[in-house]
């Protein structure tokens, strides 16, 4: 079966593993998934990201992060721009998630970046997801 939205699948796997309090998860690799995983690592939402080359597509292993008392670091993930309804924003309309407590991930002409970086560079793009 052909997967119509691999980014939504990636985000759903993270959400499900987080809710089940798994230590890590594996997903088939792609450039955009790799970029999203790196952003999650840099912003402190996941502990580590590992790339496994299997002479095919490759695999991304994401190690989830939990706080004291085993509380979840990721409270929520929402896919915004979907294949059936794309969501684009101009540079002056880049959204803030929960007044800056979360992040928006955007696909821009400069690559996949966070909402903070997009505002600093004054560029808009496609809003991929909100994470808080």
Swiss-Prot record:
One of its GO terms (molecular function) is structural constituent of ribosome. GO terms for cellular component: ribonucleoprotein complex; ribosome. Pfam families: Ribosomal_S8 (PF00410). One of its GO terms (biological process) is translation. InterPro entries: Ribosomal_uS8 (IPR000630), Ribosomal_uS8_CS (IPR047863), Ribosomal_uS8_sf (IPR035987). Keywords: Ribonucleoprotein, Ribosomal protein, RNA-binding, rRNA-binding. Gene3D superfamilies: 3.30.1370.30, 3.30.1490.10. SUPFAM superfamilies: Ribosomal protein S8. Disulfide bonds: none annotated. Signal peptide: none annotated. Belongs to the universal ribosomal protein uS8 family. Part of the 30S ribosomal subunit. Contacts proteins S5 and S12. One of the primary rRNA binding proteins, it binds directly to 16S rRNA central domain where it helps coordinate assembly of the platform of the 30S subunit. This is Small ribosomal subunit protein uS8.
């Amino acid at each position: 079966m052909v997967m119509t939205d691999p980014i939504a699948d990636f985000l759903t796997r993270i959400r499900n593993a987080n809710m089940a309090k798994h230590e890590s998860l594996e997903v088939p690799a792609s450039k955009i998934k790799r970029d999203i995983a790196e952003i999650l690592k840099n912003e402190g939402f996941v502990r580590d990201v590992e790339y496994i080359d299997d002479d095919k597509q490759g695999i991304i292993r994401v190690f989830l992060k939990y706080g004291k008392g085993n509380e979840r670091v990721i409270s929520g993930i929402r896919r915004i721009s979907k294949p059936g309804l794309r969501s684009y924003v101009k540079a002056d309309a880049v959204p803030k998630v929960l007044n800056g407590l979360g992040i928006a991930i955007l696909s821009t002409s400069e690559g996949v970046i966070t909402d903070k970086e997009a505002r600093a560079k004054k560029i808009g793009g496609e809003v991929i997801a909100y994470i808080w």
